[in-house]
């Protein structure tokens, strides 16, 4: 008989509840995310998706919390706001806090990969919104994270730039296959990117969908459209005329 060792999930959440003051937000969440899986969190505003992501990131010290969770040691967080320090150049933003000897060379290579290698010595105020978010993505991936937590990172971008960022993210993460948790309000974005989609409702995981649409994904694919409609209905959106 062959014995197989159980593989621990990259993210393990056990009966996690979270509240702010007297306002409960998460209720008894239990969740396993395997290593390398891309998970999207969908839900209406106030459903708890950002609170769950911030819990995994170890943020919000003022929250009352019960239960437990475990994540890898090497975690990067990507926000909707690029959060670049305005007094530092782009490349200095990327290398801040890095101790590796090849930090500058690696940062330049990553900026080249995201298409803004020529902006390395520029300051954030001179960048467009899309360029800032490319720099933020480069900063997150430069640290070779085992877990990337992304809170609506493309929400403030125009539609064309957002599509370019989707393609860029998929190409970059294919190299290292980090585990990814993405918070988004965009159903199409979730279906385009994720391996798995969780729908949060009133602080609980109400639905868990595996995305089986083949890559490269196209909204015209019947399976894409079917899942999109099911997700929209679960979010309370009538799909008859969509």
UniProtKB/Swiss-Prot annotation:
Keywords of the record: ATP-binding, Cell inner membrane, Cell membrane, Membrane, Nucleotide-binding, Translocase, Transport
Entries under Pfam families matching the protein: ABC_tran
Annotated ranges, domain ABC transporter: 11-227
SUPFAM superfamilies: P-loop containing nucleoside triphosphate hydrolases (SSF52540)
Subcellular location: Cell inner membrane
Assigned GO CC terms: plasma membrane
Protein topology in the membrane: Peripheral membrane protein
GO molecular function: ATP binding; ATP hydrolysis activity
Principal place of residence: membrane
Keyword Hydrolase among record annotations: no
Main enzyme class: translocase
Annotated positions binding ATP: 43-50
Database matches in InterPro entries: AAA+_ATPase, ABC_transporter-like_ATP-bd, ABC_transporter-like_CS, ABC_transporter_ATP-bind, P-loop_NTPase
Catalytic activity of the protein: ATP + H2O + aliphatic sulfonate-[sulfonate-binding protein]Side 1 = ADP + phosphate + aliphatic sulfonateSide 2 + [sulfonate-binding protein]Side 1
Enzyme Commission code: 7.6.2.14
Primary role: Part of the ABC transporter complex SsuABC involved in aliphatic sulfonates import. Responsible for energy coupling to the transport system.
Assembly: The complex is composed of two ATP-binding proteins (SsuB), two transmembrane proteins (SsuC) and a solute-binding protein (SsuA).
PANTHER family xref list: ALIPHATIC SULFONATES IMPORT ATP-BINDING PROTEIN SSUB (PTHR42788:SF17), TAURINE IMPORT ATP-BINDING PROTEIN-RELATED (PTHR42788)
Family from the record: Belongs to the ABC transporter superfamily. Aliphatic sulfonates importer (TC 3.A.1.17.2) family.
Name of the protein in its database record: Aliphatic sulfonates import ATP-binding protein SsuB 1
Lineage summary: Bacteria, Pseudomonadati, Pseudomonadota, Alphaproteobacteria, Rhodobacterales
Name of the encoding gene: ssuB1
């Amino acid at each position: 008989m062959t014995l197989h060792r159980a593989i621990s999930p990259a993210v393990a959440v056990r009966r996690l509840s979270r509240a702010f003051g007297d306002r409960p937000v998460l209720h008894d969440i239990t969740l396993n995310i395997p290593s390398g899986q891309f998970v999207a969190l969908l839900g209406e505003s106030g459903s708890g998706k950002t609170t769950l992501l911030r819990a995994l990131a170890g943020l919000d010290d003022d929250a009352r919390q019960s239960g437990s969770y475990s994540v890898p040691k090497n975690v990067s967080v990507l926000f909707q706001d690029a959060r670049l320090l305005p007094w530092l150049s782009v490349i200095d933003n990327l290398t801040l806090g890095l101790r590796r000897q090849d930090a500058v060379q690696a940062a330049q290579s990553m900026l080249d990969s995201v298409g803004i290698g020529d902006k390395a010595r520029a300051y954030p105020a001179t960048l467009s919104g899309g360029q800032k978010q490319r720099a933020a993505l480069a900063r997150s991936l430069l640290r070779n994270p085992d877990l990337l937590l992304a809170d609506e990172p493309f929400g403030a971008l125009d539609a064309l730039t957002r599509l370019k960022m989707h393609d860029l993210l998929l190409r970059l993460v294919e190299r290292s296959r980090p585990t990814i948790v993405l918070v988004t309000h965009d159903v199409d974005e979730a279906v385009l990117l994720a391996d798995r989609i969780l729908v949060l409702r009133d602080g609980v995981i109400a639905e868990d969908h595996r995305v089986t649409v083949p890559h490269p994904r196209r909204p015209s694919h019947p399976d894409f459209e079917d899942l999109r409609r099911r997700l929209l209905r679960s979010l309370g959106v009538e799909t008859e005329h969509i």
